[in-house]
A protein has these predicted regions:
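Positively charged, small/polar-rich N-terminal and surface patches that mediate targeting and assembly
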Residues: 1-91
Length: 91
């Protein structure tokens, strides 16, 4: 079974926790960890932005990544949420 870490950013801890809980309840993720705060620097609509954000890391199977990503897109407050799958090697 291939497993992945899913890296997701959110605007605040409340939203990150809500997303993590939803993913675990729906069995899209086995576990979710919320890490706070981080500073994100990115380009949006032609301008450099700098914001405080929260990172959610979800642990899941590779075959659930597409469904998990679609669910995050449905419930996330961002127009274009960051959802990145990283394969787990070892552990």
């Amino acid at each position: 079974m291939e497993t992945c870490l899913i890296y997701i950013t959110a605007p605040n801890a409340e939203e990150a926790v809500a997303i993590g809980r939803d993913l675990v309840e729906r069995e899209f993720a086995a576990c979710a960890n919320v890490h706070s705060p981080i500073v994100s620097i990115y380009r949006w609509e032609g301008a450099i932005q700098e914001d405080s954000e929260v990172v959610l890391i979800a642990k899941t199977r590779r075959d659930l990544v597409d469904e998990l990503s679609a669910r995050v897109a449905d419930i996330h407050s961002y127009d274009c949420p960051c959802v990145v799958a990283l394969p787990i090697e070892g552990g």
